[in-house]
Amino acid sequence: SILAHSLGFERAYILNDLVALGYALDVLPDYAVRQINGGTPLGSQSLVAGIATGFNVSMCHAGHVIEAELGHASLPSSVIGVLQDVLGKKGRSFNTVESLFSGRGLAALHFALGFAETDPAQITGSTTEEGTQTVVLFAQLLGLFCREMTFQYMPFGGLYLNGSVVRAITSSKLTANIIIAEAEK
């Protein structure tokens, strides 16, 4: 290919960032992974989920990575049920995985809770009651969704969450524990 030749390689591949992370799982140094719950060693099937400007997953097993565009899939009924319990009719505005689990989704959840429109970084960096309420609900919903994904994908090698939204949400031990508690119910 032109790319490979220009770089001086025999072959070159363009990979989605989540696919690249899936291939890197077996060689990531310990400092690059923050384990928030116990799991089995690598070697079993794993799932990498990226939550940032959008939502995507990659399934990883035995050196093979299969990417999937999950962001445009419908939210599971369990997540929709909680959204409607908390938000009433406003909960119906979240109909796809990415409409909730993304930076844009975090901001939309904050607004649906009746708080002022703002960007995701201000929400996750906030120490206000409004910011905390949004982040805690987002963490609960993410934990519930993680449980759904583990039933669907059976990632015995672990579920790896990645992306700017996940880093911001799990920077607090409280919200990391909320995700785990919901995922393990």
Language model features with spans:
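Phosphate-binding/catalytic loop of phosphoryl-transfer enzymes
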Residues: 1-94
